[in-house]
């Protein structure tokens, strides 16, 4: 259970020295044949740093074979974890945060600090052991937080947008928003979007392409709205991809399929103009919808629809997207 971190750095979202030593000792036992595999369970509601899962990032191989985020499961929920590890139940969840190798890569960290009130000492508010009330925190953010920042900057880098800076998504993001793994595999087909007066209806077919395990699949729908000259002139913030709907299939046996329908209200596509119109606006231009497995997959699909490829961007794009899962 995640309650501590590094005392040296004060970062409670990184491994402590004791936890690193534990992994090192487990690696030694694995190497001498005491057991075969090391599986890390992340029992935390916070998005901890995951550099220790990638030897190329952290500089040391701890011999970790798998990791599973289980959240704060409590006394009862832990019983279900055993079923997941044994394979009697197949995982079907999706991450609600972007997990980083280094949480300082989050730009909000640079707008977040703690300050003492100037007269705190006068009222004995900073005395050690007292009920400390002499500090306050200053925090600032816009929409460019979490996946909206990491995926938007990634798209800017891929497209060669001015002032995108030196940014490498693959060495920054460990697991993107919406990521989820399974003991089986799924394929999407027959993707289609229809428009009505006040909504878009997204339909697609999901097929369990595995041969052994049954499982559920979480289908995510993202959209991208046009980023216009008006938006830029008026300080309107837009992300490269926005989650606008999701649905989960029933348990699908190997080879089985299910048609999934997700409805997106047109009001979801609006953007708030705080500086000029003082209300929500809907820009003219190209809107993209895509079905994706996570936020990064969504942006790659949209980039592919715009004509971008891994080869054509000198590797700035991490993987080729699927244009069959994009509607414009």
Question: Where in the sequence are the language-model features?
Answer:
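C-terminal non-catalytic regions of proteins with extracellular/luminal or membrane-system context
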Residues: 1-328
């Amino acid at each position: 259970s995640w309650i501590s971190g590094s005392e040296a750095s004060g970062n409670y979202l990184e491994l402590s020295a004791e936890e690193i030593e534990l992994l090192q000792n487990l690696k030694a036992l694995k190497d001498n044949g005491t057991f075969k595999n090391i599986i890390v369970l992340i029992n935390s509601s916070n998005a901890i740093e995951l550099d220790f899962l990638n030897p190329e990032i952290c500089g040391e191989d701890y011999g970790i074979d798998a990791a599973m985020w289980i959240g704060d499961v409590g006394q009862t929920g832990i019983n279900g974890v055993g079923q997941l590890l044994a394979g009697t139940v197949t995982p079907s969840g999706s991450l609600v945060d972007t997990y980083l190798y280094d949480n300082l890569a989050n730009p909000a960290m640079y707008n977040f600090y703690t300050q003492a009130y100037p007269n705190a000492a006068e009222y004995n508010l900073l005395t050690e052991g007292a009920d400390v009330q002499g500090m306050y925190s200053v925090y600032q953010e816009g929409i460019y937080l979490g996946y909206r920042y990491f995926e938007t900057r990634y798209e800017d880098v891929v497209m060669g947008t001015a002032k995108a800076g030196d940014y490498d998504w693959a060495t920054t993001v460990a697991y993107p928003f919406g990521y989820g793994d399974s003991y089986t595999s799924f394929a999407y087909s027959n993707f289609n979007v229809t428009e009505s007066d006040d909504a878009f209806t997204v339909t697609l077919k999901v097929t369990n392409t595995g041969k052994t395990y049954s499982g559920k699949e979480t289908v995510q729908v993202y959209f991208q709205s046009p980023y216009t000259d008006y938006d830029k002139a008026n300080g309107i913030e837009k992300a490269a991809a926005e989650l606008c709907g999701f649905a989960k299939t029933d348990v699908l046996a190997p080879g089985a399929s299910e048609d999934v329908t997700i409805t997106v209200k047109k009001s979801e596509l609006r953007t708030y103009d705080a500086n000029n119109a003082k209300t929500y606006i809907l820009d003219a231009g190209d809107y993209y919808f895509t079905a994706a497995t996570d936020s990064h997959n969504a942006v790659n699909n949209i980039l592919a629809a715009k004509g971008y490829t891994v080869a054509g961007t000198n590797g700035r794009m991490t993987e080729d997207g699927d244009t069959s899962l994009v509607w414009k």
